[in-house]
UniProtKB/Swiss-Prot annotation:
E.C. designation(s): 3.6.4.12
Record text on subunit structure and interactions: Component of the MCM8-MCM9 complex, which forms a hexamer composed of mcm8 and mcm9.
Organism: Xenopus tropicalis
Gene Ontology CC: MCM8-MCM9 complex; nucleus
SMART domains: AAA, MCM
Region (Disordered): 1-52
Sites where the protein binds ATP: G446, D447, P448, G449, L450, G451, K452, S453
GO BP terms, alphabetized: DNA damage response; DNA replication; double-strand break repair via homologous recombination; regulation of DNA-templated DNA replication initiation
Protein name listed in UniProt: DNA helicase MCM8
């Protein structure tokens, strides 16, 4: 070992509450003119006061106790017949074999050692001496104390041996054993199984060792907790250190000096014998899996207490596994009277270890960045994932397995499937760069009754971590973060909202158009992937790396293609521009489609397990155009995703699909190939070229980043590390389908002057609609002059109500934009059509 190892163990660890001069270092006391005394029955770290009591001195005890840290862990005196001695020796043998695997400096600095429960079970010598599974569960405090004493003894022997070697090298005397100072070591057992559901956390588990997994929804402030306090006797002045079990204040009942009969004591909070530790509480909410879902019940929560090195191990929204001892606390701090509630207690967990899925406390063996909620995969799961990956047309299988109850909408399901897998976040750990989000956001807008909510619920169900909320019953605090006051302490604590609970997962928001003013709370979360809070003196930022999947109904009940998406939803452009894909679902009557849809609904109602597929001819209202959005291809993606007529389709169960998605998000991190990057760049440049008008939709780098994210998700869907040219071309087709729905007008033509994300069309949509109709008729009839009767008839057909009397072209040009006055009392639109107004007299 190096010289620095010795220095790290030299006495006087000021930061550790259990470190001190228990190796016989005297203190100058206040009373009796001597050293400080100790209570041999209660106090593990105290000192001798007077020569008449040599049997109570630390040095005398240590000479005859082979375990020098015995009094740090056990209140009873050492005895060779102690029932715990055999267990300590077994653990000492175990740690002696494992000590080279641990960082000794880290153990001293933190005051704790992490022990894998699986290693304890696999050790044959330990299993022969101690039935670990039963004894750790039934008597956890004693087993943990034995483990702590064992590692304390191993480290002490190691340090003494090293110190003796250094003394020999320096030529010093070696008659006396070197004095070393090892602090109190907590043994923290992790990977404990089985996990206990919160619904089984009952009074029968009091005092037992349990492990539970959940989401952190509330974190309190860190406070000092006094575990030992020095009390001075008012009669003789003797000082003793009195322990506070579970942090409950108590006063000594008698003085440890035999000659003194004092019964009154004064607390000495500034004494070195007063020990305080960091203390924090968290509230953990259960994870709702498919087999545990219970209707009409709020999720269960449990309070957990963290001390010392466990504090600050998690933030609201983290998924944690807490192992600890079940304790009870009295409800006297509540709002009820003590006399009526003296027997009311609440269960809480005294945490022994906290495993954070983000790797804050216990790091995984994989050094790669953890994406998504960490999941455990059995060998059976891995074989099933391998079987799914080997399917011939995997994209079609996953798209049709997402929501089999909804017929059609293959490209919409394809976009939702890509959002499930998500892209790769860039520069997440680089402090010198701003992170680039990898989670795509998708908005589905359409007429009622087309299955938007069912597809949204299916996505949240398949996601390894999904949160589903409804917009009309959601508040801003419920979406982001809430400051709540603790009734017991009066301090403010953070409670996580839906976006933080969906961190590294999916947050589905239904009825997106009915949220009101809550839209502004989503702006930061959708782009910066975080939630900032500045309230009640607390300024913090919490992670919200979630994909937002929103479903909305247009204003008025039906989608009006004469308006833009912003006008149909009455939503700002800043929010809409953050969505990677915007799908428009229209309920257009079509005989073939309606027939196949009705057959599908009847088959679902009949309970058919395997449904026969039918060829769905999706109606389209778009006409041919020379735009880049409608380049012909050999076989469009929508046709390839459809099932062939008469084909028997067996969808992947959602429970297995959730495992597949979790595996892909956790272990697959694809990158773009040069060919794929070239395809995306060409498509983006073509979009920029076609959208250079004054009133056109701004095509920015957000669209290019969306293409990159979706292409990475397409490669991750097939567990590939490299995104190919075919992946990019399929994503381009999905993007074209999204843009076609948002750019096409009520006549089926592509109008790139429509502002998809803006609201500039709202005050002149009728005028633009009127001028567009005049341009279309002029092109068909090759006549650019219109009489009053024709204009009146066109306005009537378009259901446009013209207010006021227009007797002059200048006035009409002022009232209706895109018209400019021309000589001869005629009006000329922006296009090549001249409109001659002879008489205009309408109310």
């Amino acid at each position: 070992m190096s010289q620095g190892w010795r220095g790290g163990w030299s006495g006087g660890r000021g930061g550790n509450p259990y470190a001190g001069g228990w190796r016989g270092r005297p203190w100058r006391g206040r009373g009796q003119g001597g050293s400080w005394s100790r209570n041999s029955g209660r106090d593990p770290v105290c000192f001798s006061t007077a020569p008449p009591k040599p049997q109570l001195t630390q040095t005398t005890l240590d000479k005859y106790i082979p375990y020098k840290g015995w009094k740090l862990y056990f209140s009873e005196a050492y005895s060779d017949s102690s029932p715990f001695l055999e267990k300590v020796r077994a653990f000492e043998k175990f740690f002696t074999k494992q000590i080279e695997l641990y960082d000794k400096d880290e153990i001293e600095r933190k005051g704790s050692i992490l022990v894998d429960y699986k290693d304890l079970l696999q050790d044959e010598d330990l299993s022969a001496s101690i039935p670990m599974s039963s004894e750790l569960k039934e008597m956890p405090e004693k087993i943990l104390e034995c483990m702590g004493l064992a590692i304390h003894q191993v480290l002490t022997k190691d340090l003494e041996r090293h110190a003796a070697e250094l003394q020999e090298q320096e030529g010093l005397r070696t008659e006396e054993a070197p004095i070393v100072n090892v602090p109190f070591i907590h043994a923290r057992v992790f990977n404990y199984d089985p996990l206990t559901p919160l619904k089984n956390l009952r009074a029968s588990l009091y005092g037992k060792y349990v492990a539970l997994r959940g989401t952190v929804v509330r974190v309190s402030n860190i406070k000092p907790l006094c575990v030992k306090m020095a009390f001075s006797c008012n009669m003789c002045g003797d000082i003793q250190s009195f322990p506070f079990p579970d942090g409950k204040y108590a006063v000594p009942t008698k003085c440890p000096v035999p000659e003194c009969r004092g019964r009154s004591f004064t607390a000495n909070r500034s004494s070195p014998l007063t020990v305080t530790v960091d203390w924090q509480t968290i509230k953990v909410q259960e994870l709702m899996s498919d087999d545990q879902r219970e209707a009409g019940r709020i999720p269960r929560t449990v309070e957990c207490e963290l001390i010392q090195d466990l504090v600050d191990s998690c933030v609201p929204g983290d998924m944690v596994t807490v192992t600890g001892i079940v304790k009870v606390s009295n409800t006297r701090d509540g709002g009820f009277k003590n006399k009526n509630n003296k027997c009311m207690f609440l269960l809480y967990i005294e945490a022994n270890s906290v495993s954070n899925s983000k790797g804050h406390k216990i790091k995984s063996t994989d050094d790669s960045e953890s994406h998504g909620a960490s999941m455990d995969f059995s060998l059976k799961d891995l074989y099933a994932i391998q079987e799914i990956q080997a399917q011939e047309n995997l994209f079609q299988l996953i798209v049709n397995s997402l929501c089999p109850t909804i017929y059609g909408h293959e490209l919409v399901k394809a976009g939702l499937s890509l959002a499930l897998f998500g892209g790769c976040q860039k520069y997440a750990d680089d402090k010198n760069r701003i992170p680039i989000r990898g989670d795509p956001h998708i908005l589905v807008v359409g007429d009622p009754g087309l299955g938007k909510s069912q597809m949204l619920q299916a996505v949240c169900n398949v996601a390894p971590r999904g949160v589903y909320v409804c917009g009309n019953t959601t508040t801003t605090s419920g979406l982001t973060v809430t400051l709540s006051r603790d009734s017991a302490t009066g301090d403010f604590g953070l409670e996580a909202g839906a976006l933080i609970l969906g961190d590294q997962g999916i947050c589905g928001i239904d009825e997106f158009d009915k949220m009101g003013n809550q839209h502004q709370a989503l702006l930061e979360a959708m782009e910066q992937q975080s939630i900032s809070l500045a309230k009640a003196g607390i300024v913090c930022s919490l992670p919200a790396r979630t994909s937002i999947i929103a479903a909305a109904n247009p204003v008025g009940g039906h989608y009006n293609k004469g308006k833009t998406v912003s006008e149909n939803l009455k939503m700002g452009s800043a929010l809409l521009s953050r969505f990677d894909l915007v799908f428009i679902l229209l309920d257009t009557p079509n005989e073939d489609h309606d027939h196949l849809l009705s057959e599908h609904v009847m088959a679902m109602r009949a309970g058919a397990k395997e449904m026969q597929s039918a060829d769905l001819t999706c109606p389209t209202t778009q006409n041919s155009n020379t735009s880049v959005l409608e380049e012909p291809s050999e076989r469009p993606l929508g046709e390839r995703l459809k099932l062939r007529p008469g084909e028997h389709f067996d969808p992947i169960p959602h429970q297995l699909l959730r495992k597949y998605v979790g595996y892909a998000r956790q272990y697959v991190h694809p990158t773009l190939s040069p060919d794929a990057a070239q395809v995306l760049q060409d498509f983006y440049l073509e979009l920029r070229k076609q959208n250079q008008g004054i009133d056109s939709t701004p095509i920015t780098t957000r669209q290019l980043e969306s293409l990159i994210r979706l292409t990475e998700a397409r490669a991750r869907l097939e567990l590939r590390e490299k995104a190919t040219k075919d992946d990019a071309e399929e994503v381009v087709q999905i993007m074209k389908y999204s843009l076609l729905g948002t750019f096409s007008d009520e006549f089926g033509k592509l109008d790139f002057h429509r502002s998809q994300h803006g609201s500039g069309m709202s005050n002149r949509s009728k005028a633009k609609k009127f001028i567009s109709a005049l341009n279309r008729i002029a092109e068909q009839t090759y006549n650019n002059l219109f009489e009053f009767q024709q204009l009146r008839q066109i306005a009537k057909e378009l259901q446009i109500q013209l207010l006021g009397k227009f007797n002059h072209s200048d006035k009409m040009a002022t009232e209706i934009p895109n018209l400019r006055a021309a000589p001869g009392n005629q009006l000329r639109p922006k296009g090549s059509v001249s409109v001659l107004i002879t008489t205009w007299d309408c109310a």
